[in-house]
Amino acid sequence: MDGNDAPNAGQCPVMHGHAAGTGMRNHHWWPNQINLKVLHQHSSKSDPMGAQFNYAEAFKSLDLDALKADLTALMTDSQDWWPADYGHYGPLFIRMTWHAAGTYRTADGRGGGSTGNQRFAPLNSWPDNGNLDKARRLLWPIKKKYGDKISWADLLILTGNVALESMGFKTFGFAGGRPDIWEPEEDIYWGSEGEWLAPSDTANSRYSGARDLENPLAAVQMGLIYVNPEGPDGNPDIVASGHDVIETFGRMAMDEAETVALVAGGHTFGKAHGNGPASAVGPEPEAAPIEAMGLGWLSTHGSGKGADAITSGIEGAWKPHPTTWDMGYFKVLFKYDWELTKSPAGANIWLATNVEDEDMVEDAFDPSKKHRPMMTTADLSLRYHPKLLPHAKRFAEDPAAFADAFARAWFKLTHRDMGPRARYLGKEVPAEELIWQDPIPAGTQIDADDAAALKAQILASGLSVSDMVSTAWASASTFRGSDMRGGANGARIRLAPQKDWEVNEPAKLARVLGVLEGIQAGFSSGGKSVSMADLIVLAGCAGVEQAAKAGGHQIEVPFTSGRGDASAEQTDAESFAVMEPVMDGFRNYQARELSTSPEEMLVDRAQLLGLSAPEMTVLVAGLRVLGANHGGSAHGVLTNRPGVLSSDFLTNLLDMGTEWKPSGKGVYEGRDRASGAARWTATRVDLVFGSNSQLRALAERYAQDDAEASFVADFVAAWVKVMNADRFDLT
């Protein structure tokens, strides 16, 4: 063979050997090219459910009791192809659920169990998810039976609850409402390392300085959920491991008490698997041969399953009675001294010394055998790290407090990424309102006449188009589709910490809110009421309408009332602090230099807002000419008529009479090619709409002479989409 697939004379003229989508891709040739595909993932073309499918309605028809009964029966229905430890699949399913939800991180709200993403790469093949493919395969007959009434995302979470309940634990509750995705998530940054479990001193490490973990990451190594259980980089340093435990769980929204409860509660059940050489384990699912049918980590050690199973390489159970909820974990943790040794797979583990017979652990498959309790390095940090020890001692002495803390922390773990209670479905939703759910009081409705009257007052108040538009944008654009947090509902822009964020220009914000509060008070004195959340959005709509009218377009921006106003008591300021933007390309704001380019951060923000590339294009172009820039900056305000909704930004950006050159860090100056006279200044997030071929194509379309009305209409549609992004009551 010469490698040439061109047909020889007399042969079939059809080319063979190269399928669609293969070969070198654009990102291989130009690795710094921004990735706009993240704005168009999970489209209708990859979703088999159809546009009319409503998962919330389908879930309401689910017989939850029957489903839970089937799941309970599955727990002890051991299968020969993957037998259950101790005759009970509960611990396996708890790990499955934990690892589905545990990828969540607060910095960008991405990860977590709300999409069923554990079915897809890379998560389905992470080293830390070893053999969870077997857990999902065990669930398939039940998913097949209940079909569209239960998503994989909900099933992966519910199964963990049922597993706990089947072993004697009372859970805090369960909420459905997680629709499935049907393709891998391409927007999530999992790290830059080029190998699984790369140590912290490797190239492209996520660590810098004295072990400072890169944001937004919340795991210590590529392919792990949280920490390396053997210790940092596999080094069995107990106190250092405790630091990792605190940091990674903290980045997943857990405080130290919740962290201790989760570790101890989860390790009350089951065992770890490392009863053989790691070299016997086959490739992960995505790398497995086609005949493996999606299963990975197939082992040649003995039977490859049951007593011979190898998963993490750690071997052993934490306590006696691994399928029963009790206080055994804390009992053995504090009762015994621990000696460092190696598992059969070569992993660092700690075994209790001088163990009394009552604390020996029964073998998972042979009742004639018993083993000493095992702890990982991370487990022992609960006893030896000074910040974790007080919580561990308190729980060890108070079983009721431990059970309550674990129940609440487990519920938080499995529901933190669902957003507000308005998205919760089912009869097991807890009645108690929790601060981390970002509660918002019910709003009031105003009719069209009231809205018109209020807009007239706003327009007569002295507020500029820039004031109205920028304040509404600041309020609504906090929304994150990743974990459904933020948004205009609640009007938390009035409260700490948002009112003090630099990006929101606190002095200007206070002035605008003061004017709107006066209008609100006057309206309410008439026996009616309007929330500040609604009024802020309504003011933005009024500003857009006025700007469009100034450009010759008579429009009405759709507005739906019903937002409520959250109080300071309903707002966890610390949890909102992580949402403060250090970069917002829509407002041409950058607080500091980042390792990621400004244009990439613009795309990142657009993806969190659920925007497409065309929507991002019209919003940036419109917000520039409406004066939404941070601090009134002139960068990117490519118009001679600011305050008028027009496509001037795009028209002038594409003008070949302008030559752009760098004029400072991140700033560019546009000069007349012929005269050299200064015309404009702009940033990278402005110029990208002329430099990137895909964005330029969109810019050219909206800059056409016949596209002005289309631009205005599309800007309004994208604006309304952002204003209503958190209105789960409307869907």
Curated annotation (Swiss-Prot):
Q: Where along the chain is heme b bound?
A: 267
Instruction: Give the NCBIfam families listed for this entry.
Output: cat_per_HPI, PRK15061.1
What does the protein in this record do? Bifunctional enzyme with both catalase and broad-spectrum peroxidase activity.
Q: Which PANTHER family match?
A: CATALASE-PEROXIDASE, HYDROPEROXIDASE I, BIFUNCTIONAL CATALASE-PEROXIDASE
In this protein, the active site sits at 99 (proton acceptor)
Q: Which Pfam families match?
A: peroxidase (PF00141)
Keyword Iron part of the UniProt annotation: yes
Marked site: Transition state stabilizer: 95
Spell out the reaction equation it catalyses: H2O2 + AH2 = A + 2 H2O; 2 H2O2 = O2 + 2 H2O
Question: GO biological process: what's one of them?
Answer: hydrogen peroxide catabolic process
Q: Which organism is it from?
A: Ruegeria pomeroyi (strain ATCC 700808 / DSM 15171 / DSS-3)
Task: Cite the GO molecular-function annotations of the record.
Answer: catalase activity; heme binding; metal ion binding
The similarity annotation says:
Belongs to the peroxidase family. Peroxidase/catalase subfamily.
- InterPro entries found in the cross-reference section: Catalase_peroxidase (IPR000763), Haem_peroxidase (IPR002016), Haem_peroxidase_sf (IPR010255), Peroxidases_AS (IPR019794), Peroxidases_heam-ligand_BS (IPR019793)
Give the record's subunit note.
Answer: Homodimer or homotetramer.
Task: Give the EC class as a word.
Answer: oxidoreductase
**Which keywords does this chain's UniProt record carry?**
Heme, Hydrogen peroxide, Iron, Metal-binding, Oxidoreductase, Peroxidase, Plasmid
Cofactor, how bound (note): Binds 1 heme b (iron(II)-protoporphyrin IX) group per dimer.
Give the coiled coil ranges: none
Cross-linked residues, Tryptophyl-tyrosyl-methioninium (Trp-Tyr) (with M-252): 98-226
The UniProt record lists the keyword Iron: yes
Co-factor requirement:
heme b
Question: What's its EC?
Answer: 1.11.1.21
Protein name per UniProt: Catalase-peroxidase
Task: Give the record's PTM text.
Answer: Formation of the three residue Trp-Tyr-Met cross-link is important for the catalase, but not the peroxidase activity of the enzyme.
The superkingdom listed in its UniProt entry is: Bacteria
Say where the cross-link Tryptophyl-tyrosyl-methioninium (Tyr-Met) (with W-98) occurs.
226-252
